[in-house]
Amino acid sequence: MSTSPDNLFCPEQNFYGPDSEKIYIDGSLHPVKVGMRRIKLSKTYTLHGTDFSSFPLYDTSGPYSDPSVTIDLHKGLPSTRDFWQKNRTDIEVCPGKNPSPMNNRTPVRAKQGKSVTQMHYARKGIITPEMEYVAIRENQQLEEWIERFSSNGSSVKPVTPEFVRDEIAKGRAIIPANINHPELEPMAIGRNFRVKINANIGNSALASSISEEVEKSVWACRWGADTVMDLSTGKNIHQTREWILRNSPVPIGTVPIYQALEKVGGKAEELNWNIYRDTLIEQAEQGVDYFTIHSGILLDFLPAAQRRTTGIVSRGGSIIAKWCRAHKQENFLYSHFDDICDILRSYDIAISIGDALRPGSIADANDEAQFSELKTLGELTLKAWKYDVQVMIEGPGHVPLNLVEENMRKQLEYCHEAPFYTLGPLVTDIAAGYDHVNSAIGGTLLASLGCAMLCYVTPKEHLGLPDKNDVREGVIVHKLAAHAADIAKGSPSALLHDKLMSSARYSFAWNDQFNLSLDPVKTRQVHAESSQQNTGDGTDDHFCTMCGPDFCSMKKSQEVTGK
């Protein structure tokens, strides 16, 4: 297979329809331009004394929703952040490295003895361009609405660059933004910001190609994924990652142990620190924004894991466990954690400390192995912070609803309020084929309690490698979970979104309903199919085919109230 795919194409940039337009908001502290997507509404809705004829949306699609940008996937996206970095004196070109053939850019790193992390700057009181970008992005150009909302007793205020800096300095939030990923549009992960979602992609030894994975990554961010993880374990891992990074406006994460294992022919016992270190640096120079590193699984925890119903279900965790048993030594990712942090701070790579012992069945939830590792993750968090490395903590897994709250409580206690990033949790073991819904149920509850980012699950979970349609389904369902959690947390912008949808629904403004939904394409398609028996497309009807013209409750309500 060629490592330079020739069947890539730029997707339709008017994807969201004629009522959607790309807008950019300028920063006041730095030369940043923050992209958003604005929906033009068919009428003006008055809510609490404020008129809305349009609604700005938080947008993860980058230039893929801007028709004015020419995109060539073989050359990658425009380098948004290069301009911000050009006057920096704390970075240098990596010696002996050639420019990327895609963007003609030579990788950089921190100068000797320097740290270039967002946490480092935040602790020094410096507001970076990335921090201002995040503040503008989180507000969605709704500062006036948020202020009005807070004047009615809400504790939620508009996000300021100083607030972002303070959250980063305290370790409660991260901005994953490798200095070698200039195509990135910065975003924040933290419980005092919007709940984010991650989409996993990546080939396997049995399926997929570079072009398919690039297509899935673009597809994921266009449907609303805030970050993407490339979990490739098959051929051409390096090349696949390069193509994904150069075409990604969202942060990209990886699990470096997968590529390290490939380098030793899949034999876990032949891994060593030198191979892993070289893999970290290789991926750092490409621009990976965060690494999942399973440093918390220790020899002492393995007996407890052996007593489980489903053992160790983390791929990275099982690799490390096999290495530890083969060598009768402590996890080298734990022993070399200081060395790892020294590398990460040189490129501003965040660490997602992996939950190698997450429960893979509800029978194993909240057990000794899981919480023993969680305590170790808290210990490693403090160590990483000494290096100014940004940290988030990975969480479960399979957890029944009655045990979900304990996970959040212990994570905050053990891990010093570092952001929590969880795979669901899935709340039952019997939902094969529907595990994306299963995951969203647990994720909604956990996010409402403070989980900062949900890792999506697709309908293929436990069954096979997802295709791009599975990616879409997983993203939308988890965007729903994140939005529901934002509402529960009192987010003024999330509540406004729902208020506008309700107003459009009561007004039978069908196009507004389509455009305000999480999946405008599907809602428009489903409505059109249902309306085919009537004349036209149904967008002028004051009813739908569920109730018809004579049994529509909202229509009857309007007749009764006169409004």
Curated annotation (Swiss-Prot):
One GO cellular component this record assigns the protein to is: cytosol
Q: Output this protein's name.
A: Phosphomethylpyrimidine synthase
Q: Which residues bind substrate?
A: N200, M229, Y258, H294, S314, R315, G316, D355, A356, L357, R358, E394, Y421
Name the source organism: Chlorobium phaeobacteroides (strain BS1)
Encoding gene (name): thiC
How would you classify this enzyme at the top EC level? lyase
- Supply the alphabetized keyword list: 4Fe-4S, Iron, Iron-sulfur, Lyase, Metal-binding, S-adenosyl-L-methionine, Thiamine biosynthesis, Zinc
GO BP annotations listed:
thiamine biosynthetic process; thiamine diphosphate biosynthetic process
Q: Offer an example of a GO molecular function term for this protein.
A: 4 iron, 4 sulfur cluster binding
